Amino acid sequence: MRSTLKKSAPGKPDIVLTDTLELSLKDVIAQTLKNNVAIAVQDFQSKIRKEEIITQESVFDPTLSLEGTANQQRNLTASAFAQPPKIKSNTQSLNLSFNQKLKPGTEYELRFENQRNETNSQFAGLNPQYTTRFEVNLTQPLLKNFGLDINKSSIYIAKNNLDISDFDFKNKVIEVVADTENVYWNLVFSLEDLKVQQKSVERAKDLERRVKAQVEVGTMAPLEILQAKSEVASREEAVIQAHKLIQDNQDNLKNILNIPFDSPEGLKEIQPLDSPKFLVESPVSLRDSILTAIKNRPDYLKKRKELSNKHIQAKFNENQLYPTLDLVASFGLNGISGDSQPVGIPTPSFNPFGGTFGRSQERTFSGDFSTWEGGFVFKYPLGNREAESRLAVSKLETAQLLMDIKDLEKTIVVEVREAARLINTNKKRVQAARVARKLAEEKLSAEEKKFEVGLSTSFNVLEFQTDLAEEQSKELQAIVDFNKSKIKLRKVLATTLEEYDIQMASDSSP
């Protein structure tokens, strides 16, 4: 199967059953390729296209035919030489034929005919009579339907359709893998962000305890406790929202992995083993990236194959404008035998070709009795509007597809530029978010020290705690977005499979 996946990326072969499903990103991708329904559905299309090639090739399969008939005739005759006047005859025939169409357009037939005839006519020299004939018939088109390319055009198109199906399959795999990566990092972010929100609750509760202690000793007004308790409740609500987001991302990932939600695996929580990394690589070369995308993109290669099909169809339709001019030829060998009967008035004589059925075949293949015929058949449809219209449609469809390809090329350039720009933007976001997070930590630390000596309020401390939690979440989001922007670039360049050393079987087929 051409679209079978070859996975050589390291990882666990199957999900390991523990209290949680501990999965690295490569584990998740391996499981997705193994179980994803969308990939399996697309794979069926490649199998269908492969069978369609066989269907088109079957046009050149030979046909073996065997025909057997028996008939009886009873006729009246007015001939003075017929005896008796009521003629009765019984005929049995058994014919074998073998015919085939060859790829240049040649059609041939080998035919072997055998007949036995028995009659009550007294003028039959052989009764019963055995007739044998071997015949070869040839038809060779010279204009319309002539040539390998014309007669194999449907096969060429079917093979291109298989390639198109493989491109669709590869595109689906890239799409599913990219979606899997994004969902995985969404889950990682939601889990890490939960820690941030929980830490924010801990800070608020710690401040609440400190405020309560100061209220009890009379250094703060009771209103400060209400402020602290209100903030704790607000942050606990954020934790609840974070839990909900985790569950959503868990379900999304299980759905991609095709894990039933009521199965033992589906009832467990997925625990990602990978953390998002901020690895600054060399700047993206737009020129090289565009060339890579044009070379690799399955949707672009699919359009090119479709264009090839249009050219093949146009060439075939152009051939159909030609008149039919066929050379026809036939060559036959024949022989007879049977039981010799005396025939003749007034002196009866015997037919010299008497003998058994086998003798009839011997005479046939001796080559002494033969026939041949040769000639041509010429046909020209007046007007020929159907063929002209089909050719015009082919040319219009080709021009339309060329414009579509040009438009896709522009789209690819735009997508590559956007993906490269997004990486650079997210890199700057991470750098800025890190600075902002560090400053928020310093601001909170300074404000807490002021609070300890009575130079700040709980409101200010809570506000700085909120700022720190927001900056920590922003930094996490920026790092995840940076990793997702690299996913997008790989998808746009169609290098996703190479990243995980995933090969299509069609990539290694001759």
Regions found by a protein language model. Name each.
Residues 1, 12, 74, 253-264, ...:
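Acidic, low-complexity, intrinsically disordered peripheral segments
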Residues 1-91, 138-153, 157-159, 184, ...:
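Bacterial Sec-pathway N-terminal export signals of envelope proteins
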Residues 16-20, 68-136, 272-282, 315, ...:
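Small/polar, glycine/serine/threonine/aspartate-rich low-complexity segments that form flexible
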Residues 40-44, 48, 57, 103-131, ...:
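Sec/SRP-type N-terminal targeting helices
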Residues 166-289, 422, 426, 446-449, ...:
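Periplasmic alpha-helical coiled-coil/stalk elements that build and connect Gram-negative outer-membrane
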Residues 190, 204, 303, 310, ...:
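Generic beta-strand/beta-sheet core signal
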Residues 436-486:
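C-terminal structured "cap/appendage" subdomains that terminate the fold
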